[in-house]
Amino acid sequence: MLAYLRYNPEVFQGKTILLPCDDPEQSNFTKYFARNFERLGLRKLISTSYAGSGRPRQVSLFDGTVLDTPKRPYEPHGRIAVLDHAICDDDIPWNYMEGNGDFRSKEITALRDEADMILTNVPFSLLQPFLFWAVESRKQFAFIGNMNAITCNDTFPLLMSGQIWLGATQPKVFITPDGDHKSFGNTCWITNIDHGLRHEPVPLMSMQENIAHNERLRRILLERYKQNPNALHYEKYRNYNGIEVPILEALPSDYTGVAGVPISVLNHFCAEQLELVGCSVNADAKALGVREIGGEWIRAYREHGGTGNYTAHMHNLVLLTDGGVPIAPFKRILVRLKAPDTSGDL
């Protein structure tokens, strides 16, 4: 949230925020916006959760406090909290909803249509339907999702068209309700809210500068690709007109063709610097001109001990290096450098 505030200090000013997958009692999203309601200038905060997702509750007969028990009254109903002012403690008032709190229900969809922004940590198994539900609303949104899911056939076109992009940070550590810390390396923010990092170009060197000075690249060319140390170079794909760039910082500044880069490029993607051409592993690979792997590469791959589930008619990007090493790079994002804008130059 701080990245959006730094880029636009009034991003939340006068907004109604919907948190559609956030238990009013336990969600850190809810607590953050409830505590910072006035500072952010919110108009309204709505937090809802699915039936049965909250902490079991029962009122104690002895002291009137709420205790955790196995009993789950009113389980068919979701929970909702609606705030129009700050609440600085964790005792956020809430009520049961008429329905089960599923974000796809008419009840939650009506709240979506009322809101200005949708923010949450959606269950990863529901990421795609939630994404389409959010995009359909034409509202601003940001939610935590799985990095690999955004390159699927149905979701990647939203990236290509500029309807969504990745947030400024990668949430990697999560605190569970019992206090444990869980780490994930492939999570990201999926959003359509602008932030400053989207407009910061990645510093790049020329092809020759990378080969001479980029030690990570040199090590890959020597050790993984088995290249001649006196003739290091960027490898070309065997079945596509483009070069393989195994690490993002090795993208050459003087190469005008298509380059395949790791999916991590989406965390640093600057639309003013790069053109998004496509993804190497979804159904569009063939349409992009990626040819069949072919039997020769398959034979070399098997001879080198490869056990992956590849066939000659697949359209995955592959390399057959000058050192004779068959390589099938993991999921690649295809990009092309844009020409610098010199319209303002004298």
Predicted regions: what they are:
Residues 1-346:
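Class I S-adenosyl-L-methionine-dependent methyltransferase catalytic core
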